[in-house]
A protein has these predicted regions:
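Alpha-amylase-like alpha-glycosidases and glucanotransferases acting on alpha-linked glucans and related
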Residues: 3-4, 92-93, 101-118, 143-257, ...
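Short, solvent-exposed turn/loop segments enriched in Gly/Ser/Thr/Pro and often Arg
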Residues: 12-15, 57-66, 131-141, 261-267, ...
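Short, polar loop/linker segments at the starts of domains and inter-domain junctions
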Residues: 19-38, 362-367, 538-549
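Loop/helix patches that line or flank the sugar-binding groove of alpha-linked glycan CAZymes
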Residues: 66, 81-82, 340, 352, ...
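Residues at alpha-helix caps and immediate loop-helix transition turns in enzyme cores, especially N-
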Residues: 113, 270-271, 507-509
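C-terminal beta-sandwich/jelly-roll accessory domains of carbohydrate-active enzymes
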Residues: 502-565
């Protein structure tokens, strides 16, 4: 048996373990509470393992800017003008070498609690992924936990220079930062930054807009953006060296992989330099790139640097439009063809912390309509798949938590708890006692689907064969609302069918002769197909010259194990 297909469970610990149901909009940690690393218990992790997951990606683990006062623990006070929400953005890192204190039961022992969590994760048979945020840091970055003899970012910068390859930041000499318009509290002291630094989303202005990443500052990797984009990589820039040390530090703590935030905003040359060095010392460690520019995909995969890339602008965007009825299901084929032979290197998902929940009013408006997209996402290839916590329960993301507002997303900026996840948590029991029948059924569907993808060798490691081209003229198949394909090895074949229609359908599927020879079944004539997802369905018998007749539920699908007789 080959290595398992990767299934990643993405979760924000601050919300995952929080059982406080106060949920006061813009509430403090004292009012609304916070989940802790200890809530990622052996029971919870074993539940994930049984549900088919191989990895857990914890976001918000590293210390990030927050309005909560931890000065009594020696942690510097943050300034509210440069923080989004009370809890702050997990992507505005204030100390690359520290654990976020919100997640600790004993703040003074927060690193010990993280290391114990890593140990629990590994004992459960799962692997840990954390965020590596290389492009920007919190505006008031100040590492109090950096190792001895490690200089802090910016501590040796020549701030009179707008650009220097030896600086860690970009500066706007003679200009003071102005972000006061974004803060509506009563703080009497204005945040001072002089000279102003460039903002994280490449905004070289002393007065960033509310739409900019104003809570962050851009890191300098030796590219002079205001000087025509000239690159100064020899000698190796100081920022490169600091970032390599940070990656090695967290790898030494037992981290099994890094999801690299906004990787395309950092020079490709840096990744080509740093990843081989980390992998040499920690073989098998994963690097996943958040990337939205398809023209850069292959350069990020060259020389086995990044292991996987986000497939947001390809498969995710197409599946969302197909599920909503904006595009025909046949466009899924074009999404796959657009990445060609690197499709197995793409990380598939239908939810994450940046995107709107499937069941939200901004997407499908119902938890009952997500199965078709998830079947395609999970079964289309050997590549990894990610599930966002609460997705498997049909979480709608329609709370108005505070900074985020009601936008169809689960907040990453506020202290909050998620109703569906909180009831599943059930004070650490992680059971179905407080879940509705629909929530249980959806959770069971996810578990069955993920486990099938690793149990069936055809889905785990098999080749892909698109059946859409053979069914465009098939009057018994709607190529605008159904999608069908084969996955197979020399020993096993699976037929996967998804129905994006709001109605149950009876369809026929034509399988061309070429497909049988493609899977070395040219000597077989008669076949049976056993349904794997829906146990109440009967097996189907067919011959090579026949169309296969199937009944597929609305907004769902089926996986059939095909055997030759």
């Amino acid at each position: 048996m080959n290595s398992n297909k990767i299934f990643i469970y993405q979760a924000l610990p601050r919300l995952l373990g929080n059982t406080n149901d106060t949920n006061k909009p813009n509430g403090s940690i004292e009012e609304n509470g916070s989940g802790k690393l200890k809530d990622i218990s052996a029971k919870f992790l074993n539940t994930l393992k049984r549900s088919g997951y191989t990895h857990i990606w914890l976001i918000g683990v590293l210390a990030h800017a927050s309005k909560t006062d931890y000065t009594k623990f020696g942690i510097p006070q943050e300034h509210p003008e440069i923080i989004k929400g009370n809890a702050g953005s997990p992507y505005a890192i204030r100390d690359y070498y520290d654990i976020d204190p919100d997640l600790a039961v004993n703040v003074n022992k927060r690193m010990d609690e993280f290391e114990a969590t890593v140990d629990r994760i590994h004992k459960s048979g799962l692997k840990l992924i954390i965020d590596f945020v290389p492009n920007h840091v919190a505006r008031n970055y100040n590492s109090i936990n950096r190792p001895p003899r490690v200089a802090d970012f910016g501590s040796r910068d020549k701030k009179t220079l707008a650009f220097s390859a030896s600086n860690n930041f970009y500066y706007l000499p003679g200009q003071d930062l102005n972000v006061k318009a974004f803060y509506h509290g009563n703080n009497a002291i204005t945040y001072k930054e002089s000279p102003a630094k460039a903002t994280g989303n490449d905004a070289f202005t002393a007065q960033p807009s509310v739409y900019d990443w104003y809570e962050t500052v851009k890191l300098n990797y030796g590219v002079d953006y205001q000087g025509g984009g000239s690159k100064y990589f020899d000698p190796i820039p100081d920022t490169w060296k600091k970032m390599k040390n940070i990656l090695l530090y967290w790898a030494s703590k037992g981290t099994d992989g890094f999801r690299c935030d906004m990787a395309e905003m950092v020079p490709t040359e840096f990744w080509q330099w740093v990843i081989p060095q980390v992998k040499k010392k920690y073989p098998g460690i994963l690097f996943i790139a958040e990337i939205y520019n398809p023209t850069l995909y292959r350069s990020f995969l060259d020389n086995d640097n990044f292991d996987y890339l986000y497939d947001k602008v390809g498969l995710y965007d197409v599946l969302r439009d197909v599920a909503c009825g904006y595009r025909p299901s046949s466009d899924i084929t074009f999404a796959l063809n657009s990445v060609g032979d690197i499709q197995h290197k793409m990380l598939n998902f239908v939810e994450n912390h940046d995107e709107q929940r499937i069941a939200s009013d901004f997407f499908l408006k119902s938890r009952d309509k997500s199965e078709a997209a998830m079947i395609v996402t999970s079964c289309i290839n050997t590549n990894p798949v990610m599930v966002y916590f609460g997705q498997e329960l049909g979480e709608r993301g329609m709370d108005e938590e505070g900074f985020s507002g009601r936008d169809g997303r689960t907040t990453i900026f506020d202290y909050w708890s998620i109703d569906t996840v909180r009831r599943w948590n059930n004070n650490g029991k992680w059971n179905n006692d407080e879940l509705t029948e629909k929530e249980i059924n959806l959770k069971d569907f996810y578990s069955k689907l993920l486990n099938l993808c690793n149990k069936e060798s055809s889905l785990r490691e098999g080749k892909f064969y698109d059946l859409m081209f053979a069914n465009y003229q098939n009057t018994g198949f709607d190529s605008t609302r159904q999608y069908a394909f084969l996955r197979g090895t020399d020993e096993e074949l699976s037929l996967v069918v998804a129905n994006f229609s709001n109605e149950e359908v009876e369809i026929t599927i034509d399988i061309p002769d070429h497909a049988f020879s493609f899977f070395n079944l040219s000597k077989k004539y008669n076949f049976t197909a056993f349904p794997l997802l829906s146990s109440f369905k009967n097996k189907i018998s067919f011959s090579r010259q026949d169309s296969i007749k199937l009944k597929i539920e609305a907004n769902s699908g089926e996986i059939y194990n095909v055997s030759g007789l």
